[in-house]
């Protein structure tokens, strides 16, 4: 059990056999008769239940819902399978009406293009970040990263030149550029990984190699933060623009997360590997608890890291929340939406 973040804002539970309960104004984590951890509700923003075999009392759930503290349940691989949130967060009707209407006009197309270009720019900057100290120490790797970043920049610039009236008119072209960018990005990252690991490239669900397992787990933690930001902005997490709608698929969350995957999770995971931090999977292709603890701590610390945004330095979690609010403002025709581009 651990409290993570700069101000101990996130409680992470990842030990089988533990139970989360409420005592006065604190959440308490017990295993058998032992008290493992306490978290004051006053400072808490989120609870992550990161494995099976962990129980949560109804009193603890009620206290979190009353205070707007989101509880997210993750599989061992980091896939979010349930959220407990306050129903009051879904009460902004005007924003949701405009969000749905925007799909069939240029607002929807603008957002789809913005999410995709933001993703490509941030992938390019992640490669630049990994290359910036290698120009003299490892010139070949520097050139690999530089060329990859240039290629991603070219794709992003080409995306920005597409014109149309609705997202359905251009979705195939957008996804083509995004897919080409993904191939280039992951191929380049493979060459920049400084440790010997069995990694053939990016896999999502069902991955059993350590790199993809770490990425998937990190994305799961980020996903919970993005969904919370989307809901707090009054948006419907299931009505997206870039990702195709399917029953049970949170398309808008998957749209918004694209700008943040590379600067948050990719930077953490490849940083850990290249620093020699021990990460491994067990015989069943699962991340053991100690690796999940390391990843959760690193991702949440990264979200507390500060980046330049709107002419000031802000925590990444604050930037994420502001982007969601800018998105809500945009669909209501009250302001622009620009992608967050992380520095390097």
Question: PLM features: residue spans?
Answer:
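Short gly/pro/ser/thr-enriched loop/turn and capping motifs at secondary-structure boundaries
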Residues: 77-83
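Extracellular/luminal Protease-associated
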Residues: 41-55
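NTP/phosphate- and nucleic-acid-binding module
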Residues: 26-28
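Short hydrophobic alpha-helical runs that function as membrane-insertion/retention elements
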Residues: 47-49, 69-75
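A short acidic, amphipathic alpha-helical/loop segment
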Residues: 59-63
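Short Asp/Glu-rich motifs
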Residues: 83-84, 249
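Short low-complexity, flexible loop/linker segments enriched in glycine and/or proline
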Residues: 86-90
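Active-site helix-to-loop segments that bind/position phosphate- or nucleotide-bearing substrates
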Residues: 1-23, 32, 39, 66, ...
